[in-house]
């Protein structure tokens, strides 16, 4: 089973579990690092999550994963916050984080570049609009966004 298939299946299990606890499932990753496999589940909620939130989801998800036992390898389950550079995955994320600094990568160059950093000004049917520098606005179509995340403000 491919890593993306495992992550997708875990996401299907974890999303309703998180939602029952008032949490948002941001992302699930199944990766190999240094010869060890990690199943990473990133959660959030307005105001941020705490250790109790992570522990509660970790316990329930661990039991559910043991019950279905579809992951063919041993792994370490990690449940945590997405951190300061949280990925932007859903249209709602772009509404929630309007006004924040973001970094967006595109599949193909737009106006000669594939990496954009700026302030998130809004989103709509056509895509995401960010302010680059002082006065330049760029609208990035939804289907061109390969990766987007919040950027740390100093």
Curated annotation (Swiss-Prot):
GO cellular component terms attached to this protein's record: cytosol
Source taxon at top rank: Bacteria
InterPro entries cross-referenced by the UniProt entry: Ribosome_maturation_RimP, RimP_C, RimP_C_sf, RimP_N, RimP_N_sf
SUPFAM superfamilies reported in the protein's UniProt record: YhbC-like, C-terminal domain (SSF74942), YhbC-like, N-terminal domain (SSF75420)
Protein's cellular compartments: Cytoplasm
Record-level GO BP terms: ribosomal small subunit assembly; translation
Major place of residence: cytoplasm
Signal peptide: none
Record's keyword terms, sorted: Cytoplasm, Ribosome biogenesis
Family the entry assigns: Belongs to the RimP family.
Job of this protein: Required for maturation of 30S ribosomal subunits.
HAMAP family cross-referenced by the UniProt entry: RimP
Protein name, as recorded: Ribosome maturation factor RimP
